Amino acid sequence: MMKLVLFSVIVILFSLIGSIHGADVPGNYPLDRSGKKYPCTITWKKNPSCIQICKKHGVKYGYCFDFQCWCEIFGRLKTFKI
């Protein structure tokens, strides 16, 4: 009985650790024609210019991260220059 309780506590702790970190959403920085990342000045989740840039690259959502536009679910295979 004690082993079952201990096992249950361990499983609960590991599941809590996983939920704290959450799942990382894959993404990438889109590149312009010269191969550079698109700059942005306002780092917040709903940056209209970054969303527009990401839509041009075929991605539904993007935001400003570290003063550069970041597109979610944008892998290396989809990286192209417009």
Curated annotation (Swiss-Prot):
Family stated for the protein in its record: Belongs to the long (3 C-C) scorpion toxin superfamily. Sodium channel inhibitor family. Beta subfamily.
Misc: Negative results: is totally devoid of toxicity when intracerebroventricularly injected into mice and does not compete with radiolabeled voltage-gated potassium and sodium channel toxins in binding experiments on rat brain synaptosomes.
Protein name as annotated: Beta-insect toxin AaBTxL1
Keywords: Disulfide bond, Ion channel impairing toxin, Neurotoxin, Secreted, Signal, Toxin, Voltage-gated sodium channel impairing toxin
Organism per entry: Androctonus australis
Chief subcellular location: secreted
PROSITE patterns according to UniProt: LCN_CSAB
A GO term for molecular function: toxin activity
